[in-house]
From Swiss-Prot:
Region annotated Alpha N-terminal domain (alpha-NTD), chain positions: 1-233
Family listed: Belongs to the RNA polymerase alpha chain family.
GO BP term, example: DNA-templated transcription
Gene3D superfamilies tied to this protein: 5' to 3' exonuclease, C-terminal subdomain, DNA-directed RNA polymerase, insert domain, RNA polymerase, RBP11-like subunit
Annotated keywords: Chloroplast, DNA-directed RNA polymerase, Nucleotidyltransferase, Plastid, Transcription, Transferase
The record's note on its domains: The N-terminal domain is essential for RNAP assembly and basal transcription, whereas the C-terminal domain is involved in interaction with transcriptional regulators and with upstream promoter elements.
Name the UniProt record assigns to this protein: DNA-directed RNA polymerase subunit alpha
Organism, scientific name: Cycas taitungensis (Prince sago)
Length: 340
């Protein structure tokens, strides 16, 4: 029992991407698994990650627009199909990405008749449009559509309070959150006191950053929250050590041996199920019929072994090999003599 507890405590949880895709330029999806975790850890991490994903990641939005000779949000402009209100709503939906903070200016100057889209926005070099086809306005006559825009990078959302629009400058409600939604679920396994958990995390983004990047940024933000406390505690410990004349032993992740790394990877593979990967249903159903349910089970087979499974041909083997290499950097051996 003591040895089991020690082995559990030395396992390092790892994130794995087990699914990804893009429904459109403005909707990207990713599914991730974190394991192994002790009982209760998955809920703690899941709640924190979801809140960090939805509230702590910066995004870029259009926050103000200036239209000449327009006095009210619900004004109609001759030669433009949409009202000013509709144009502002369309500008609010434009998805942008930028690196530096601060306010940037952009503009549109188009002569109709024609449709105005996001690709017509003249942007500073530091800002990029994610979907250039997003609609802004329809010019029905030969008029000049001239608009000035202000772009900001921030986090959360900013609801503009009603006020008088001076000099034709209209504030736009800004939703800076690049993560549209995030959900998590927990799978428990084991018996008795040796219960462990897997955290599954689903992330949808607006395309300005990939779900994998959102996961990294949320993790980084959570770590940054605790660093000041860790530094303060280290200073207190150093002060106590100097008074007592003793030294605390230093700890470094680089001290972990290669054997431990391999052991942790093997443990993680035992709890990643093949039906959660990008394999087609026909492929993992064939594998399930011969009791191959996890990546650990799968890695006990060579390509030649898989070819002997009923209705499992060369194309299926290639699909399995592609998923293993893409998501786990693992090569499936060609024959049983190359396993391990």
């Amino acid at each position: 029992m003591i040895r089991d507890e020690i082995s559990v405590s030395t396992q390092t949880p790892r994130w794995r991407c087990i699914g990804s895709g893009a429904d459109s330029k403005r909707l990207h999806y990713g599914r991730f698994a974190l394991s192994p975790l002790r009982k209760g850890q998955a809920s703690t991490i899941g709640i924190a990650m979801r809140r960090a994903l939805l509230g702590e990641i910066e995004g870029t939005c259009i926050t103000h627009a200036k239209l000449e000779k327009v006095t009210h949000e619900y004004s109609a402009i001759i030669g433009i199909e949409e009202s000013v209100h509709d144009i502002l709503i369309n500008l609010k939906e434009i998805v942008l990405r930028s690196d530096p903070y601060g306010t940037r200016e952009a503009s549109i100057c188009i002569v109709g008749p024609r449709n105005v889209t996001a690709q017509d926005i003249i942007l500073p070099p530091s800002v990029r449009i994610i979907d250039a086809t997003q609609h802004i306005a329809s010019l029905t006559k030969s008029i000049t559509f001239d608009i000035r825009l202000w772009i900001e990078k921030d986090r959360g959302y900013r609801i503009q309070s009603p006020k008088n629009y001076q000099d034709g400058i209209f504030p736009i409600d800004a939703v800076f959150m690049p993560v549209r939604n995030a959900n998590y679920s927990i799978h428990s396994y084991g018996n008795g006191n040796d219960i462990q958990e897997i955290l599954f995390l689903e992330i949808w983004t607006n395309g300005s950053l990939a779900p994998r990047e959102a996961l990294y940024r949320a993790s980084r933000n959570l770590i940054d929250l605790f660093i000041p406390f860790l530094r303060a505690e280290e200073q207190n410990i150093d002060g106590m050590d100097n008074q007592n004349g003793s030294n605390m032993p230093s700890f470094s992740f680089s001290n972990i041996s290669a054997d431990m790394e391999r052991m942790e990877e093997e443990v993680a593979f035992k709890h990643i199920f093949i039906d959660q990967s990008e394999l087609p249903p026909r492929v993992y159903n064939c594998l399930g019929r011969v009791n191959i349910h996890t990546l650990s089970d799968l890695l006990n087979y060579s390509q030649e072994d898989l070819m002997r499974i009923g209705h499992f041909g060369k194309k299926s083997v290639e699909q399995v090999s592609e998923v293993l290499q893409k998501h786990f950097a693992v090569d499936l051996p060609k024959n049983k003599f190359q396993i391990h």
